[in-house]
Amino acid sequence: MGELLLFFSNILFLLFLVLGFTFLLLRRLFIIKQNPNKNLPHGSMGWPICGETLAFLKPHKSNSTGSFLQQHCSIYGQVFKSHLFCSPAIVSCDHELNMFILQNEEKYFQASYPKPMHGILGKLSLLTVSGDLHKKLRNVAVSFIGASKSTPAFLHSVEKLSISMMESWKERKQITFCYEIRKFTINLMVKHLLSIEPEEPIAFKILEDFQTFMKGFVSLPVYIPGTHYANAVKARARLSRTVREIIRERQHENMRAGEGDFLDVILKKRSLSEEETVSIVLDIMLGGYETTATLLALIVYFLAHAPAVFQKLKEEHRAIRKSKQDEEPLNWEDYQQMEFTNNVILEAMRCGNVVKFVHREAIRDVKFKEYLIPSGWKVLPVFTAAHFDPNLHENPSEFNPSRWTVCNQLCPGAELAKVEISFFLHHLVLNYR
């Protein structure tokens, strides 16, 4: 009897597999027939179902565009069609088109991350929602970041955590810098968002869950128990539960007077539901945790290979320290004097490529120059191509912070990260070689 059940279960599995394969193949043929030769960019659609996804995601050094993009751009040009993440796609390595895509969010394009990512990010994440809900959640995040970056309380937290972390290194022969800096960024986020101190057990629990979360974020998105993806989905659920418990505790205590963290501000406004509040807190924690930590690790790597840059950076921070009293804390005016530090951060962002590309989808037919981008197609603006374009950057493979002579406009989240990194670097370069 057991063998018979196993036989039928295998037959059903194969049947569902064939039906799924057929559906995706017919969908692909339908979309292509709906857009026959409408000035589509040249390109290759690759294999059925997976298309060219595996080749596109093949690991490569962060200071290059990788063999896939190099080969396709040399054959098809800077803009080409492909089949990626189970969808027909337009890949753009053209700086002008990339800017056009980013400047026309919600008008011509919307976020379109693969469905399995929703299981990790959550259905209300800023990366997965669109339209009015996206605007609503984004406005909350932007208001928090804009109000936080220059407040004495936030600046004091950044400096205090920087100093305490480096103090903890003194009795150790070696450290794992990437782990240490992730601990620094998550402790800073939970302190400023939720008033949780680094030494509290819950802070360590949140760090562990975020580490598990990130392993699944870049893994094969198949939910099989024990895989990185399945563990990440569970970690996200635990993080949501942790934040939800804190929210309900605050509400039960009638929002403790004087706490003044981000969660208190949201709860007092009463503009978000509980699930929206949980999601926006986790989104800000994710952005402040992974991208900031990765960028800071890259900066240390680049400085180790550029002694002249390190020396110039050290001189800038020595001058700032000499202008202050002993143990006088850094302030917003000090940050504004860190001009070369800002250039180092911008150059590390260019050379390190923390964010290689983003997922977008055309919500209507879009004509750009001689190309047509059909409605419903995935659009992937690739930023690394512009970062290493010799027409935009002289000697693009060289780490040269002095190339940044113009103040670039960055998103509010990037500005917050720059403050954290600048204060951390201040104490790092003055205390370590």
Spell out what each predicted region is.
Residues 39-45, 49, 155-159, 206-217, ...:
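Cytochrome P450 I-helix active-site segment
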Residues 2-21, 41, 73, 162, ...:
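Cytochrome P450 proximal C-terminal region
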Residues 185, 291-316, 414-432:
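Cytochrome P450 catalytic-core helices
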Residues 2-136, 157-164, 235, 364:
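N-terminal membrane-proximal hinge/A-helix region immediately C-terminal to the signal-anchor transmembrane segment
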Residues 63-71, 110, 270-279, 384-419:
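Cytochrome P450 heme-binding Cys-pocket and its upstream "meander" loop
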Residues 2-21, 83-90, 149-160, 169-191, ...:
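Cytochrome P450
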Residues 20-24, 86-99, 123, 140, ...:
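Hydrophobic mid-domain F-helix/FG-region of cytochrome P450s
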Residues 146-150, 171, 186, 217-218, ...:
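Conserved cytochrome P450 catalytic core segment spanning the I/J/K helices
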